[in-house]
């Protein structure tokens, strides 16, 4: 049991580390996405604020010169009443001064006659509403029409139209140039055998070729039938006498031989000296 504990714990730790890495990657991606959204929002806010400021400055440029800008800004940002003196003391210094700011509006006048209808107004530029409202002398300033905007994105694909009338047949085109040789295709299926052709003319005799290389040994043939007995050969020459062989072992004792024929009578012996009488031996019997 203990030998399986270490691999199991190591596998669990590896899975946990892998899950932590995946979660960390997801968090980093979310933070990066949020950062891009914040940067984009700040950039859009800066563009909107710059556009609003340029519009505020542009309202005063067409109708006011450089000498009366202070008066225009004075109408936008009004000074406090305590900044002016209690008495007018501008008689001696009023020579060559620019015109002052417009005075307060008068009492409402009577209703005038109905005027003619005005021309159709120009399309306003798309943008954001100004955060600062102010009163400009002479009412709204007629700004010139701006340059054409950028081309908008392509619209959605419209519904298919009705099929058009068939066009007239066009002129026949010229034959195209022959194309390059294509890749050799795979071998097609075997066709059916053709009809037997007519016998061709007799060919010329071929030249005798040189001797060919020796062929490989053939397989052994079947054993043939037994042949007729051959003629007796000539008698061989007697061989030389060989050396004497070793003495053989003693043979078995032979049987007793037959008695031979009686021998011839012997000659009489000489007379011996006298001695004791000795009888003569008996004669042998004849078989």
From Swiss-Prot:
Residues 184-205, 238-252 have a biased composition (Low complexity). GO terms for molecular function: structural constituent of cuticle. Gene3D superfamilies: 6-Phosphogluconate Dehydrogenase, domain 3 (1.20.5.320). Keywords: Disulfide bond, Nucleus, Repeat, Signal. Disulfide bonds: none annotated. GO terms for biological process: collagen and cuticulin-based cuticle development. One of its GO terms (cellular component) is nucleus. Belongs to the cuticular collagen family. It is found in: Nucleus. Residues 95-287 are annotated as: Disordered. This is Cuticle collagen 38. The lineage of its organism: Eukaryota, Metazoa, Ecdysozoa, Nematoda, Chromadorea. Residues 145-200, 215-273 form the Collagen-like domain. Collagen polypeptide chains are complexed within the cuticle by disulfide bonds and other types of covalent cross-links. Probable cuticular collagen-like protein. Nematode cuticles are composed largely of collagen-like proteins. The cuticle functions both as an exoskeleton and as a barrier to protect the worm from its environment. Acts downstream of the Wnt signaling pathway, perhaps in the formation of the adult cuticle. The gene is col-38. Residues 98-107 have a biased composition (Pro residues).
């Amino acid at each position: 049991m203990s030998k399986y504990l270490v691999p199991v714990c190591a596998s669990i730790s590896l899975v946990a580390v892998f899950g932590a890495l995946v979660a960390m990657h997801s968090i980093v991606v979310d933070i990066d996405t949020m950062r891009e959204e914040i940067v984009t929002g700040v950039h859009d806010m800066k563009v909107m604020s710059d556009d609003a400021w340029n519009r505020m400055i542009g309202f005063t440029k067409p109708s006011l010169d450089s000498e009366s800008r202070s008066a225009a800004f004075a109408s936008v940002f009004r000074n406090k009443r305590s900044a002016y003196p209690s008495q007018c003391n501008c008689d001696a210094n009023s020579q060559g001064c620019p015109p002052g700011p417009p005075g307060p509006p008068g009492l409402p006048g009577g209703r005038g006659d109905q005027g003619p209808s005005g021309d159709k107004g120009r399309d306003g530029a798309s943008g954001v509403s100004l955060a600062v409202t102010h009163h400009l002398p002479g009412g709204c300033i007629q700004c010139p029409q701006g340059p054409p905007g950028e081309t908008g994105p392509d619209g959605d694909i419209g519904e298919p139209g009705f099929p058009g009338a068939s066009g007239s047949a066009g002129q026949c085109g010229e034959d195209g140039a022959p194309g390059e040789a294509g890749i050799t295709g795979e071998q097609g299926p075997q066709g059916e055998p053709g009809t037997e052709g007519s016998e061709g003319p007799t060919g010329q005799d071929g030249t005798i070729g040189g001797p060919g290389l020796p062929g490989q040994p053939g397989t052994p043939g079947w054993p043939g039938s037994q042949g007729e007995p051959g003629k007796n050969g000539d008698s061989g020459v007697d061989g030389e006498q060989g050396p004497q062989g070793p003495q053989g072992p003693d043979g078995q004792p032979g049987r007793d031989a037959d008695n031979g024929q009686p021998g011839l009578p012997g000659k009489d012996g000489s007379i011996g000296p006298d001695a004791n009488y000795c009888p003569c031996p008996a004669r042998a019997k004849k078989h």
